[in-house]
Amino acid sequence: MQNLFGAGDENMRLLEQLLDVRISLRGGEIVVEGESERAVDGAQAVIRKLMALLMRGERVDTALVRVAVGLCEKGELDTLDTLFQDVVATTFRGRPIRCKTIGQREYVRAIRRHTLTFGIGPAGTGKTYLAMAMAVAALKSKDVERIVLTRPAVEAGEKLGFLPGDLSQKVDPYLRPLYDAMFEMLGAETCQRMQERGVIEVAPLAYMRGRTLSDAFIILDEAQNTTQEQMKMFLTRMGFRSKIVVTGDPSQIDLPRGKRSGLVEAVQVLDGVPDIAIQRLTHEDVVRHELVQAIVRAYDAHALRAKEEYSDARDGQVE
């Protein structure tokens, strides 16, 4: 029961909060009580599903409880089983990497089926991590010969020549999140050897200009901070037998005022083009601390209110 209830009963406390029920353990049996019969039935169904996953060796945590409740409310609880059937990749320590939400599963499927995939969504949805996992899997299966990871160094204005140190020292602060994910999947020593052989390349976006990248799995991270010109330049680097994943969060644009995000434009321009997928993740796909999900929802609601207020003010001026 400890694995089901979680540390300090956090899993069951969260289930109580989400479904407005009371859960207790009496004589070795789990008892669910509440004012709503539907809520009680839902909580019981979620608990049965979580227990079945535990019996299969899966780990139950608060992130999984949130996903299970969300699926239960949509009448899709049984789809939770399929999330654990597909191992995206394996870390160098042998831990399987799986999708944790339906949105993540659709994102991974889109990457598999398309040459170019845009992963759009807030922080904590696994956009970059899952793209990295897919890249490593493609490299191990010899579908590609190398991995190219890049992101715009917007904080430095891409004028890296003014910073002290060699190229690696200049760009490392901007590329550290990509290194972290790569180290977890391949191990630091393996990554270093692969970089020395050119199998893995990590570089700022400015260094992609003038190149054609063939037989490669290419990831552009933090793409909301590309300009329109940079995005077009990057997308036209694609060579034969390559796959590109572009990730970003349009709500976190750090470009100078007046500069339009290349990611925002690309999603509009390329929507509907064959072999290009645009996969949007939401707060429901956030798999970090539950407070992150609440923060994302709050900011989304604030942005919506601001948009409505702006629209109302503009309509008033027109009148």
Spans of model-derived segments:
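Short amphipathic alpha-helix segments
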Residues: 2-17
